[in-house]
């Protein structure tokens, strides 16, 4: 699983260990339960310590649970979660779309490639939406993949987020300024 590869890489270069010095880390597994979520919430609400929660696109925690306010101050996505093209259901759906496109030509607006991309961005947008739940909520959203530089991918992100997108070589400074701004708002 890609998440496990990222974590292993971070451990090999000691980034993961640096995270552990600052925050308690929780990692979603296939069998993740309510217990993991409760421990995460307790760390934030009771211990007032903050925490990192690693989830996967399409997993229970990235789709069905809200992380409003201090439960979700950052969403960091790495890569694009395109579905497996060898999945039978996806193959059949794309073949049907291609058949309809051939039959109706330009009158049939959907293409198999746009359908495939929409499946990917549905997952991304669901994950992003877990952390910003009301008008006064805020979170840093990091979309880490070179393909986000392409207009066709940016256009799949909600318009209200598109307005705030920045590409940055000094991301740490940008994030620090973001949280300084929101800390001052509360005073």
Where is each model-derived feature located?
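ASCE RecA-like P-loop NTPase motor cores
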Residues: 1-187
């Amino acid at each position: 699983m890609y998440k496990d590869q990222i974590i292993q890489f971070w451990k090999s270069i000691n980034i993961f260990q640096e995270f552990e010095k600052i925050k308690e880390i929780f990692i979603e597994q296939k069998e993740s339960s309510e217990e993991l979520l409760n421990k995460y919430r307790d760390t934030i609400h009771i211990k007032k310590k903050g925490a990192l929660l690693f989830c996967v696109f399409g997993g229970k925690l990235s789709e069905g649970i809200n992380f409003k306010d201090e439960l979700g101050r950052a969403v960091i996505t790495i890569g694009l979660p395109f579905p497996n093209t060898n999945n039978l259901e996806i193959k059949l759906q794309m073949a049907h779309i291609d058949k309809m496109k051939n039959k109706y030509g330009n009158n049939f607006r959907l293409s198999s490639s746009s359908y495939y991309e929409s499946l990917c961005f549905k997952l991304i947008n669901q994950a992003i939406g877990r952390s910003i739940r009301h008008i006064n909520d805020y979170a840093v959203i990091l979309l880490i993949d070179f393909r986000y530089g392409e207009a066709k991918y940016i256009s799949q992100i909600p318009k209200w987020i598109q307005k705030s997108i920045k590409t940055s070589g000094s991301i740490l400074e940008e994030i620090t300024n973001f949280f300084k701004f929101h800390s001052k708002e509360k005073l």
